[in-house]
Amino acid sequence: MHSLTRIKVLQRRCTVFHSQCESILLRYQDEDRGLQAEEEAILEQIAGLKLLLDTLRAENRQLSREEIYTLLRKQSIVRRQIKDLELQIIQIQEKRSELEKKREEFQKKSKYWLRKEGNYQRWIIRQKRFYIQREIQQEEAESEEII
């Protein structure tokens, strides 16, 4: 039974490692949801700024030089804000890509530990069957000696 005890220890260790990987995967999933929500919020901001930019056009109006400069300045500010938000989206997408790579890595580790745990479980079952068969054979041998 000594080897059976060792196998059970190894199986428990695999279970712990597997559950750690699963908790990390859940944390990554939550982080990805947060980044996705942030990206969607920024996209909404960009859409709003583009609408604002459309309203800042000098369509068939007589404008003084100051009004033209003011309008151009406002358009420039809005365009700059749009570019900044687009840059933030790129950064978020890069973070999500890195997160996806980490998630895939931990998924592989999780599957590895789950597979090892299953192997140890099957080994435990085989060992128990072996011990039971050996006990039955010993009992049969003892009963034959008695007869």
Swiss-Prot record:
Belongs to the SpaM family. This is Surface presentation of antigens protein SpaM. Pfam families: SPAM. The keyword Transcription regulation does not apply. Involved in a secretory pathway responsible for the surface presentation of determinants needed for the entry of Salmonella species into mammalian cells. The gene is spaM. The keyword Cell cycle does not apply. Keywords: Virulence.
